[in-house]
Amino acid sequence: METTRSIGSTTRAVPCAPASFRIDPALVFSSGFLATLVITTVMLLLLWFGVAQVDLPIWVSRLFVSDPVKVQAVGLGIHLTMGLAFAWVFALVEPQLRFSPSQNGLIFGVVLWAMVQAIGVPTLSAVAALIRADDSVFAGWFASRLGVGAAMASLVAHLAYGVSLGVVYGRQRNR
C-alpha cells in the first residue's frame, strides 16, 4: 500500500503499512515463545535420534563462559531471546506476504535458515576458531564441514519454527 506525502514542493508515493496494521506485543511474545518451544523440541528429538546439530546459542555461550552448566543456561537464554526477536521480525514482515499463515511461516523459516547457515554459522564458528586458535571448529558455509545432516537438521528445525510461528501468529492476527 502506498500513500502520498508532500515534502517541500515535491509529492512522492511512500510505501507504508495498511492503516489497520498493528502489532500486538502479547501475540508476538506468545507466538514467538511457542515457536521457540517447537524448534527446541524438534532439535532435541533430532539429537535423541543421533542427528548432528548446529547449535549456535551454545557456540556463542562458550565464547563467554566455560562452566558446562553455565554454558547450557546462557545458551538457553540466547536461544529464547533469538526466538522472540525473530518473532518480532516476522510480525513486521508478515503483513507484506500474501500467502496463507502456514505458507508465510514456511517462507520465513526457509529464509531464516538460509541466513543462519550463510552468515551465522560461518561467522560464529570462525570467531570460535580464532579465539581457540583451532581451525577444526570452523563449520563452514551451510555447516559444510559438519556434514549434510547438520544443515538438514537445522532446516527441519527452522521449518518447524516458521510454520508454527506463521500458524499461531498469522491466524490470530487475522481474526
How would you label these PLM feature ranges?
Residues 2-175:
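Juxtamembrane/disordered regions of integral membrane proteins
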